[in-house]
């Protein structure tokens, strides 16, 4: 008990440094080591000062100029025109009914082997079909996926054959 009274507790309070915003008023926190500029503004200012022969003082730095990258619009327009052409070519009477039946049957998840409804607990096999918990393993259903060749290809892809140059002996 006497030992506890002699021990003086020191405060273990951690203080975070005050956050200062960027000097260019971009909204990001500034760093005192970079004259209160954020990383983006500092990189832009250093790039502009290195490209120009006259170095600007930190108080007279201007806002950084970011290049504007324009996306190619021709690809978007051509794909939109192709989609319109595809829509125009479809007949509207017959396939609409069959597509509604197909979407209705695909929304019901059933086991491929026993046709039991599996819902969200279904397991998708590597052969591409959906199975229940009883048929989820490849030996429980007639799986058409070749696991041996897939593993062989994966091993060959991950471990390429390295051949050294032939040593010429004199």
From Swiss-Prot:
The keyword Zinc-finger applies. This is Zinc finger A20 and AN1 domain-containing stress-associated protein 11. The gene is SAP11. PANTHER family: AN1-TYPE ZINC FINGER PROTEIN, ZINC FINGER A20 AND AN1 DOMAIN-CONTAINING STRESS-ASSOCIATED PROTEIN 11. Induction: By cold, dehydration and salt stress. It comes from the Eukaryota. Keywords: Metal-binding, Stress response, Zinc, Zinc-finger. A zinc finger (AN1-type) spans 105-151. It comes from Oryza sativa subsp. japonica (Rice). GO terms for biological process: protein ubiquitination. GO terms for molecular function: DNA binding; ubiquitin-protein transferase activity; zinc ion binding. A zinc finger (A20-type) spans 16-50. SUPFAM superfamilies: AN1-like Zinc finger, Glucocorticoid receptor-like (DNA-binding domain). May be involved in environmental stress response. Pfam families: zf-A20, zf-AN1. Zn(2+) 2 binds at residues 111, 114, 132, 135. Zn(2+) 3 binds at residues 125, 127, 141, 143. Zn(2+) 1 binds at residues 22, 26, 38, 41.
């Amino acid at each position: 008990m006497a030992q506890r009274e002699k021990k003086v507790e020191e405060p273990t309070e951690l203080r975070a440094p005050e956050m200062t915003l960027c000097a260019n008023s971009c909204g990001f926190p500034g760093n005192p080591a970079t004259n209160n500029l954020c990383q983006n503004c500092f990189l832009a200012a250093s790039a502009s000062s290195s490209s120009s022969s006259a170095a600007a003082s930190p108080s007279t730095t201007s806002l950084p100029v970011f290049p504007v990258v324009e996306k190619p619009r021709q690809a978007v327009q051509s794909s939109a025109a192709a989609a319109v052409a595809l829509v125009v070519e479809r007949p509207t009477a017959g396939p609409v009914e069959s597509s509604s039946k197909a979407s209705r049957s695909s929304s019901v998840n059933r086991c491929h082997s026993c046709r039991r409804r599996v819902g969200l607990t279904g397991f998708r096999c590597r052969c591409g079909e959906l199975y229940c918990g009883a048929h989820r393993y490849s030996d429980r259903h007639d799986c058409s996926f070749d696991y041996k060749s897939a593993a062989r290809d994966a091993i060959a892809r991950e471990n390429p054959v390295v051949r050294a140059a032939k040593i010429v002996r004199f």
